[in-house]
Amino acid sequence: RVPEDSALLTWWDYGYAITDATGLATFHDGGGQTSPKTYFIARGLIGSDPDELYEITQYLATEGNRGIAENNISPEALIKAVREPKHKPWDPIYLFFTADMTGKFGAISKLGSWDIENGGSKPSIYQYLACNKFTNKEMTCRGAKIDLQKGFINDQLTLKRIVFVRNGQVLQEQKFGHKRGLTLQLIINGKNIVEVQLIDEGVFRSNYNQMFMLGRYRKDLYEETF
């Protein structure tokens, strides 16, 4: 059971519902989604650095929007302050991932990839493929034929890896010899492939994908709970 004085870092749209159902605090909700916290939470989720997510969480828990405002002298000064938190949270902090965040990843990455100095963002998404045939050699999907031996899609796009996932854990990871390419994540339930995700390298390496989808996390920073 989660201790009563805990706080949950999750995406804002469940903020009110979580607090109403559990009495636990959240970092942002429907009333605070436009605060600077939302940018940093999104940045931590889509980023590939576990340390940065840890530091963002620590800073938001101890300094919040006031600390952001006080250090918003320049983009460099603000990021430096967030990456070097000076205080430890008194209460336990939980990262609360939900499956629907996968579909919202585009919106999250649009916010989290915002260039706070020059403006503009580079959102990424999980692309879902509708596949109806699977053999050891190839997959046939709507608009795509995937060579599982050489790592090509329609003989043009390259695959860097294929990852088989069940219950949030990696069963198998098959790597190809391509320096660049996309990742195919096959979500398995029982013995059946129930979801096929095509993602770029940034999404694959994001903290959200590594921790929630693949069950990979830094054990010196995080502890998994159910």
Which sequence ranges carry the predicted segments?
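Extracytoplasmic
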Residues: 1-226
